[in-house]
Swiss-Prot record:
Gene3D superfamilies: 3.30.70.260, P-loop containing nucleotide triphosphate hydrolases (3.40.50.300). GO terms for molecular function: ABC-type D-methionine transporter activity; ATP binding; ATP hydrolysis activity. Belongs to the ABC transporter superfamily. Methionine importer (TC 3.A.1.24) family. GO terms for cellular component: plasma membrane. It is a peripheral membrane protein. The keyword Translocase applies. Disulfide bonds: none annotated. It comes from Pseudomonas entomophila (strain L48). The complex is composed of two ATP-binding proteins (MetN), two transmembrane proteins (MetI) and a solute-binding protein (MetQ). Pfam families: ABC_tran (PF00005), NIL (PF09383). Residues 1-22 are annotated as: Disordered. This is Methionine import ATP-binding protein MetN 1. Keywords: Amino-acid transport, ATP-binding, Cell inner membrane, Cell membrane, Membrane, Nucleotide-binding, Translocase, Transport. Residues 33-270 form the ABC transporter domain.
Length: 369
């Protein structure tokens, strides 16, 4: 009876994906997941976990959700597969409101939405093969089809040689690969990642991110992830939203948000990735100049790779590069430079105006003698 009801659902089960080496880019004109005025208040809590969320997630993109602890990240993520029921507003998937779905239609929906977690949730008494196969057995998939699918997925995640191994014999990264394979058994269109790399070391994290990027590219999945690791967002996401106390405070392309964060919460979250002064120079910074010959210290956030000699000449005086670097996010070169400017004919206000002609964001860090 459940299968018959699922077939009548307005959102049909996804057709099996066919792997392709062609990169699939997000469709900028199509919202795969849409939040409209979304709110969530838990019983006994005066402060809503989510409030007034209006947000689109594009089909085929990797979308990041960041924020401080308690900002509402997990609550928002779990409304997509209705593990959390919103108190207000709507969640639309392919323009269909999922709020009225009965149990049968929810089953059909959740088979289209895979999910991986920080903790791998593998069954210790079952092999890698059996862990991946289990959801297919529960769904009543025929044995031949189960074998084909499990074999295909273990090859995709690089575990073909580990199919008869038990979880206790696997590394953390290998366990997460099993979790990813299991999340893909029903050919989902959306993959939710809840702190999927936070229990892994940096090298293993990099390999899991590359796997997620490959899955997104080859299968065209929409990937939505939450993480407290800003480097993960920088390395893999197309766009990002910043939550604070259940509300959206900033959103946009990752290179734009990371290159010139506007909200104080975003700046705080990104601080570990920011270029910093050496401690010896930091200790000598003053809020105001101690003498007429004191240098002003500026931090410039740049998009692209400017001609430094022209920049220095434009600022006037004696310009010294104290710290800096350029990295690529997506297809965009982003740089941060910390400069000291001494003896410029321009005052601090004029220096800031001149520097803003070169940089997306300029900050006065202080003055040094």
């Amino acid at each position: 009876m459940a299968q018959a009801s699922a077939l009548r659902a307005p959102i049909p089960p996804a057709e099996p994906h066919k792997a392709t080496e062609q990169a699939l880019r997000p469709d900028v004109n199509q919202a795969h997941v849409r939040f409209i005025g979304l709110g969530k208040t838990y019983p006994g809590q005066a402060q809503p976990a989510l409030h007034g969320i209006d947000l689109n997630i594009r089909r085929g993109e990797i979308f990041g959700i960041i924020g401080r602890s308690g900002a509402g990240k997990s609550s928002l993520l779990r409304t997509i597969n209705r593990l959390e029921q919103p108190s207000q507003g709507r969640v639309l998937i392919d323009q269909v409101d999922i709020a009225p779905f009965d149990e049968d239609r929810l089953v059909a929906l959740r088979r289209r939405i895979g999910m991986i977690f920080q903790h791998f949730n593998l069954m210790s008494a079952k092999t890698v093969w059996q862990n991946v196969e289990l959801p297919l057995k529960v769904a009543g998939v025929a044995k031949a089809e189960r074998q084909r699918k499990v074999r295909e997925l273990l090859e995709l995640v690089g575990l073909s040689q580990k199919q008869h191994v038990y979880p206790a014999q696997l590394s953390g990264g290998q366990k997460q690969r099993v979790g990813i394979a299991r999340a893909l058994v029903h050919d989902p269109e959306i993959l939710l990642c809840d702190e999927a790399t936070s229990a892994l070391d940096p090298e293993t994290t990099a390999s899991i991110l590359e796997l997620l990027r490959d899955i997104n590219r080859r299968l065209g999945l929409t990937v939505v992830l939450i993480t407290h690791e800003m480097a993960v967002i920088r390395d893999i996401c197309h766009r990002v939203v910043v939550l604070e106390r259940g509300e959206v405070v900033e959103q946009g392309e990752v290179w734009q948000v990371f290159g010139a964060p506007r909200h104080e919460v975003t700046r705080t979250l990104l601080a570990p990735l920011q270029t910093r002064l050496p401690e010896t120079l930091q200790a000598g910074l003053r809020a105001s100049p101690a003498s007429r010959d004191a240098a002003v210290v500026l931090k410039l956030s740049l998009v692209g790779e400017p001609e430094l000699s022209a920049l220095f000449a434009d600022l006037g005086g004696r310009v010294r590069l104290l710290q800096g670097g350029i990295e690529t996010i997506g297809e965009h070169a982003l740089g941060q430079l910390i400069l000291s400017v001494r003896g410029s004919p321009l005052d601090t206000r004029q220096l800031l105006e001149r520097a803003r002609g070169w940089a997306a964001d300029v900050e006065v860090l202080g003055h040094v003698d």
